[in-house]
Amino acid sequence: MKRARNLLVLLLLAASAAWAVPEVDQPAPALKGVLFSGEPFDLAQMRGKVVLVNFYSSYCKHCAYEIGNLETFYEGHRDQGFEVLVVGVDALADRHRVERMVGLYGLQGVMADDLAESGFERSYPTPTAFVIDRDGVLRSKTRGSKTPQYFTEYVLPLLTK
């Protein structure tokens, strides 16, 4: 009985580590998968760029509001090494809704259920964004819509370093 209990505790600890919440000023967790475009991606391979990972739902009114702001900032700063990755948290049956919205705004995206590897927790309110600096360190975690002021405060300083 004691052995089974110890095994259960070890399994719970391992599971909680796998779904740990990423912490600011710590290395960004792993994130790998295949984009809607069919291209593979690996967040670790994006070192040298500032990356905004945005958890998104096609049913979220705040997500719909902010996606135009994401596109505008991305278009104005991608030449400085800025990338946006939209992670759709909708059910796979709604993949077409997320893919259409992401494509309409010229961003790259993936469905959370299609990820090959993710160290990000799967239960974020949408939208939730993580900004990762050029060294692969998580610099901010923000819930709610991203406004132009958000980009000026949290992303622009990382691009000008």
Locate predicted features.
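Hydrophobic beta-strand anchors of alpha/beta hydrolase catalytic cores
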Residues: 52-53, 84, 129
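Structural microenvironment flanking redox-active thiols in thiol-disulfide oxidoreductases
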Residues: 64-104, 114-118
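N-terminal "domain-start" segment that seeds a small globular fold
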Residues: 19-43, 109
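Short active-site neighborhood of thiol/selenol oxidoreductases, capturing the structured segment around
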Residues: 43-61
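Thiol/disulfide oxidoreductase modules built on the thioredoxin-like
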Residues: 101-107, 113-156
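Active-site acidic short loop of glycosyltransferases
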Residues: 47-49, 79, 107
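Positively charged n-region of N-terminal signal peptides that target proteins for export
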Residues: 1-6
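Bacterial N-terminal signal peptides
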Residues: 7-16
